[in-house]
Curated annotation (Swiss-Prot):
Family statement drawn from the similarity comment of this UniProt entry: Belongs to the BCCT transporter (TC 2.A.15) family.
Organism listed in the record: Vibrio parahaemolyticus serotype O3:K6 (strain RIMD 2210633)
Protein name: Glycine betaine transporter 1
Domain of life: Bacteria
Record-linked Pfam families: BCCT
Localization in the cell: Cell inner membrane
GO MF entries: transmembrane transporter activity
Induction of expression: Induced by NaCl upshock.
Alphabetical list of InterPro entries matching this protein: BCCT_CS, BCCT_transptr
Amino acid sequence: MTKGIDKYSIDSTDYTVGQDNVQKWGFDVHNPVFGISAGFIALFLVAALVLDAHTAKTALDGLKWKIIGSFDWLFIIAGNIFVIFCLALIVSPLGKIRLGGKDAVADYSFMSWLAMLFAAGMGIGLMFWSVAEPVAYFTGWYETPLGVEANSPEAARLALGATMFHWGLHPWAIYGVVALSLAFFTYNKGLPLSMRSIFYPLLGDRAWGWAGHIVDILAVLATLFGLATSLGLGAQQAASGIHHVFGVEPGLGLQIVVITVVTLLAVVSVVRGIDGGVKVISNINMVVAFLLLILVGLIGWAASLGSIPTTLMAYVENIIPLSNPFGRTDEAWFQGWTVFYWAWWISWSPFVGMFIARVSRGRTVREFITAVLIVPTVVTVVWMSVFGGLAIDQVVNKVGELGANGLTDVSLAMFQMFDVLPFGNILSIIAVVLVLVFFITSSDSGSLVIDSITAGGKVDAPVLQRVFWAFMEGAIAVALLWIGGSEAVQALQAGAISTALPFTFILLAMCVSLLMGMKTERQ
């Protein structure tokens, strides 16, 4: 091995994986990352008990919108940089580098790998927003993209293009930067599977000190709060769907039952590990999602399948104006939708990025970015076209609840669309099952990620730790719903999104650090 290749590897530092860990009560955790992270979580829960949920939501919402309003340009420009960075790596000689070394073999089949990264990356969001978002843009539910006239033919076209913009290349580029950086420094340089390892070329041994501690603690909090938010809001949405399909009262009791069932199944999954748990559930997820897509596409083929070229062309034609943060005439829509999404994707990136890295050994950089960036974007074009195109068609032709009243409840929009389709009840039941399976994949993969960070980058920490974090996600979600309902959960979401500001700078630094590391790999 040449000197250049060793420059940023584990061999160039005295640090060893897990050297700062403490083994106690069956745990093997990093000191101080685990302790400080747990302390912040406890502090948040105490504050939630002491403070009024409405007051907390108002305060954190104020912080969130202050950040979004003041740094909208930064989020958008950074997102553009990440897309360009990833596309450049695909075509550059660096794309030939194999994660894990030239002789590394992929741990998972291509389809299982795609299933896992897609379930972690988008998951339940596609279920609810693939109908609600295009309808919202078309009808002007909360303004319209680029100031287009609501309910016009151009609005229908741009609604699909703008929805695709929010779920296409940009979010996957954000995830791709984090995932590739972690995978490269872990599998090619032998560093711990932890966020701090990415910055070893920039920080040197300071990465193992407080600079690294802060990065890892931020990643833990953003991931845990993001997952708890997803579980809390998702439980409310799932309960609404169950009520719509089966008539069960969608109150706090049903929401807690949903979270409990999801958490218990996630615990079973994390105990079985990636091969026996996460991979199996992700594969089931992909099959059920594909089944739902095919059924809806065939039933509403004229409106749904016919929207695919419209969505693709609208996305391509409008990606530049939608990516431009300056001189916008649609500022309310721009900040309320695009900038909010970018902040959410960035705050979500430590979780998704680390999980993708965990399952991506053996892929070349070119194969990795193509799979992480291009393949999900193509799948999302089809998904958004089928569901969004059919939903807009119902609005235009005054069909069903969507046609009569437009978007009235985001969590019910998909089920309302199914109501007027043949076999609508069957489609709704499949959708409820898929929502629950998406929950499980988010919870189990998130537990693996948090466990790795709080274990100092170890991937073989005690099973008890993974179980602890899976229960913690569910417990926080239940506690917040119990204390303050949706307002408490939305307060947590606002807090999680606020971490996007420091993480934007962290991700930009990742690009620099990754290039430094990859250049030595080529020597």
